[in-house]
């Protein structure tokens, strides 16, 4: 039976929360993190860093939505750079991001603009209105997240018109600050903003 750790093992550097993780994650020698290539209504992009939410015992609303780019409890946008991003703490956690040996992003059928709906065909070359047919693998989480972000930004550019089954937010990956967490995770001079 999987159960929560005995004490809080993830601590958010803005001092807002700390939380438990599941015991199997705490005891793991290493983690292989598998995510899908897709956008997300609140985080705007959702890859391996956000995938670690499943390792934390509390609901995601309490943990992360307050630092997402598009949605906060007070309804305000949290756009721009050098803002607190909880994903940086997750990427830097010794139990989560630092214990991840391999990051995999499944883009065989790339996601549409709404994470709750099905995949759509991609327009950018070499796909040319076909499925993405891609897998991304890296030991470097910042690198794989950056490549996936570039991929999504190229496809979901506000010009391409995707299938109406999932095109609600055509321009999600092109918002000011969407890659702020990647800049922070890659740059130690910004560590005071998010300090895992």
Question: What kind of region is each of these model predictions?
Answer:
Residues 1-194:
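Extended, low-polarity segments enriched in aliphatic/aromatic residues
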């Amino acid at each position: 039976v999987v159960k929560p750790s005995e004490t809080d093992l993830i601590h958010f550097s803005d001092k807002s929360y700390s939380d438990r993780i599941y015991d199997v994650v705490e005891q793991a020698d290493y983690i292989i993190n598998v995510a899908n290539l897709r956008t997300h209504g609140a985080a705007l992009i959702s890859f391996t860093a956000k995938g670690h939410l499943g390792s934390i015992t509390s609901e995601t609303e309490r943990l992360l939505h307050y630092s997402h780019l598009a949605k906060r409890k007070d309804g305000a946008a949290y756009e721009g750079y050098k803002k607190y991003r909880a994903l940086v703490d997750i990427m830097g956690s010794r139990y989560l991001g630092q214990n991840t040996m391999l990051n995999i992003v499944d883009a065989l059928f790339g996601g549409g603009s709404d994470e709750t709906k099905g995949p759509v065909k991609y327009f950018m070359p070499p796909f040319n209105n076909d499925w993405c047919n891609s897998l991304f693998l890296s030991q470097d989480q910042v690198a794989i997240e950056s490549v996936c972000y570039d991929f999504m930004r190229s496809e979901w550019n506000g010009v391409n018109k995707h299938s109406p089954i999932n095109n609600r937010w055509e321009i999600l990956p092109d918002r000011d600050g969407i890659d702020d967490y990647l800049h922070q995770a890659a740059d130690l001079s910004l560590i005071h903003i998010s300090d895992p």
